[in-house]
Regions:
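C-terminal helical/coil "lid" or tail adjacent to the Rossmann-like core of SAM-dependent
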Residues: 2-9, 13, 187-243
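A short acidic, Gly/Pro-enriched loop at the edge of an enzyme's catalytic core
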Residues: 94-105
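Class I SAM-dependent methyltransferase SAM/SAH-binding core
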Residues: 38-42, 46-95
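Short glycine-dipeptide loop
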Residues: 59-60, 129-134
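A short glycine-rich, Lys/Arg-flanked "PGG" loop and its adjoining helix->strand segment in the class I
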Residues: 119-131
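Conserved catalytic/acceptor-binding region of the Class I
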Residues: 136-201
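A short SAM/SAH-binding and catalytic strip from SAM-dependent methyltransferases
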Residues: 104-117
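Conserved class I S-adenosyl-L-methionine
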Residues: 1-37, 48-56, 71-75, 79
């Protein structure tokens, strides 16, 4: 899925929701970062996590935010303006402009599942990571990502269309094997699953509904059907029978 300015805006707003905040807290708690460390955030988006990492490593440390989107990096630059220890890199995850073994820790959030050759990106991250350094990744089990409240058949068609948005629907199930093959150890998975029963601006569901609707239109789902789907979700929310579920998984691993 290409991150246009509109998609990037929705992504940043979803990241600022309560679920996005709790996800960042989980990443920060899982990532063993100390003052003076160098940390890389792969596909940093609008820089929400970068600002926290910059505080963690302090003035003697450094944080690198990598993203292929110029729009996202512009937002990250604004978000991190007060932090002089942040450098932004405009590139893809399979071509990181950093020396070998230069980072104490690397994090990525909802990134790897969008990369077709994920093995090349994992190998590149491993090149940059110091031996003994930690990689913390969050990816979604997309088979368990679902809105509830619309007509079942229509809902299924919308969700089926959305499956084309990423290359790896169930990447967390594959990561332990891939990381083991690269020499990682102490691999552990943590569920970050959540449920939204409301459709308001403090929930990721509010923004993801808009994102899915736009993507479905691009997959040739009729505009009338997409409109009906959104109307049915709104009615379900008003009647107290709306739901949205998502199953992110945090995978942490130490490079051997």
């Amino acid at each position: 899925m290409e991150f246009s300015s509109d998609i990037g805006r929705l992504q940043r707003r979803a990241a600022s929701s309560m679920a996005g905040m709790s996800r960042r807290q989980a990443i920060l708690e899982a990532l063993p970062v100390s003052k003076g460390d160098h940390v890389l955030d792969i596909r940093c988006g609008g820089g929400h996590l970068l600002a926290h990492l910059a505080k963690d490593v302090g003035d003697d440390g450094h944080v690198f935010g990598l993203d292929p989107s110029a729009d996202q990096l512009a937002e990250a630059k604004t978000h991190c303006a007060e932090h002089g220890n942040v450098t932004l890199l405009h590139s893809f995850a399979d071509a990181i402009d950093l020396p070998d073994a230069s980072c104490h820790a690397i994090t990525s959030t909802q990134t790897l599942e969008y990369i077709e050759d994920v093995d090349a990106s994992l190998a590149e991250a491993t090149r940059v990571l110091m031996p003994g350094g930690w990689l913390v990744n969050v990816s979604i089990l997309w088979d368990h990502f679902c809105f509830y409240g619309a007509d079942a058949d229509l809902n299924a068609r919308i969700h089926d269309a959305f499956r084309a948005h990423c290359h790896h629907q169930m990447l967390p199930m594959e990561l332990p094997g891939k990381l083991t093959a690269l020499g990682y150890r102490h691999i552990r998975d943590t569920s970050l699953a959540f449920v939204n029963a409301r459709l308001n601006a403090n929930t990721p569901a509010f923004y993801l509904e808009q994102l899915i609707a736009g993507f479905a239109l691009g997959q040739s789902v009729a505009e009338a059907d997409v409109t009906t789907w959104r109307e049915q979700l709104a009615a379900a929310e008003a009647e107290g029978r709306f739901g949205f579920t998502s199953f992110p998984v945090l995978t942490a691993a130490c490079r051997g």
